[in-house]
Amino acid sequence: MRIYASTKIWHPANLNIGDAATIGPRVRLYNQGRIAIGSRAVISQGAHICASTHDVTDPFFQLMLRPVTIGDDAWIAADSFVGPGVEIGTGAVLGARGAAFRRLDAWTIYGGNPATRLKVRVMNT
């Protein structure tokens, strides 16, 4: 695994990282809730992954932990945002500056804010 020195990790104990994963420069892992990053996954520069939110119906605005899972071989491209409770499927791609607020299917490429499906990711063999 490779984690750049400029990466910000809120709570290291709530972070699981698979073999050969890369966490790029200026990535923010706001992991009050658990964040799991799969093997060979890439989190590119400036991405922000957030595993908590607030209960907007609670008068005290209580914190709610919502774990984030990023599958093996997934890529979260530059300056993207992955929101609380989101699962990024195996091999999925979230394009640059994309914002994921719901589950992204495996081996599918997404882009935009909110992220929308662009096409199936096909690997060269």
Model-derived features with residue positions:
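Flexible, glycine/small-residue-enriched loop-and-beta-strand segment within the central core
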Residues: 5-17, 22-87, 108, 113-114, ...
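Beta-rich strand-turn-strand
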Residues: 78-102
